[in-house]
Amino acid sequence: PSIQSCAQKWYAGRKGLATGVIGGAVGLSGAFLTLFVRAALRGFGPVQGIRGAFWALGALTLPVCLAGSAVLSDPPQQKQRKSGKNGIDLSPGQMLRTKQYWLCAGAVCFSTPAVLLFSPIILKLGMERGLDETAALWSIVLGSVGSAAGRMLMPMLSDHIGRRATDLGLFAASLGLSTAFWAARGWWVVVCYAGLTFCYSALAAVLPALSTDLFGLPHAGVNYGFLALGQSVGSLAFPFAANLLALENGRHLLAIAGAAAGFAAIWALHPVRKDPR
């Protein structure tokens, strides 16, 4: 959240682009980590097994993060004031008292089942529906590619057509893909799953810009953190419900219902008044 809120302050006129580049890097990391960990489990050079993978990732991450944090800073206050077009500046406490917060957090929560109910079982699901193990692995790789593309492209599109229109389109696509995924077999499992990861990651990537559109830039990091709690709730509640109720095909029903509920939440979303009470 801190990196994305900082980027939005520097590029207030292109917030979607700024957060999309960051989100694209996050999405690509999924493909890298999948291949890296599988290679580490087979062993290469000094990297042997899962412990070796963690040591290697730590050695790569530490200098990169330290260097990045050394140069990361907010723009001058004068530039921030010129960039504040909507005049909204809600503290976290004020934001929590608006219905817009609960609609946004609810939409984020309802975006999760389409992917998170299936990501732990996608290899098993693919093989049950006619793919061999090698082909089923492509669902993970192409899912990561879809995630990176969604995180990069859709926030940029939202700069032009608006966050609400973008999210409505993504939830509608997620609803259609979730329905198709229920009956998909063979390579259509991979296609549908990659499309769902595109939509899910795109919805997550548009959220930081949507947050600052609604609630302002000054408290962007904390406000975004509160909105992201919806994702945490969804990522725990929906899998728990599916496991508790021993749902198999029911997972697809939860995903379809979640996409429909998310669409309804965004449809009901409108800008915050400048003097919320």
Enumerate the predicted regions with their spans.
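Symmetry-related core transmembrane helices of the 12-TM Major Facilitator Superfamily/SLC fold
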Residues: 51-70, 251-269
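Flexible cytoplasmic inter-helical loops of multi-pass small-molecule transporters
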Residues: 73-90, 277
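Structural signature of the two symmetry-related core transmembrane helices
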Residues: 165-179
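Helix-loop junctions at membrane interfaces in 12-TM secondary transporters
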Residues: 183-192
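Extracytoplasmic gate region of multi-pass secondary transporters
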Residues: 93-156, 238
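A late C-terminal transmembrane helix in Major Facilitator Superfamily
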Residues: 21, 30-31, 214-247
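Helix-to-loop junctions at the C-terminal end of transmembrane segments
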Residues: 151-162, 246
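Intracellular juxtamembrane helix-capping segments at the cytosolic ends
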Residues: 1-11, 18, 202-215
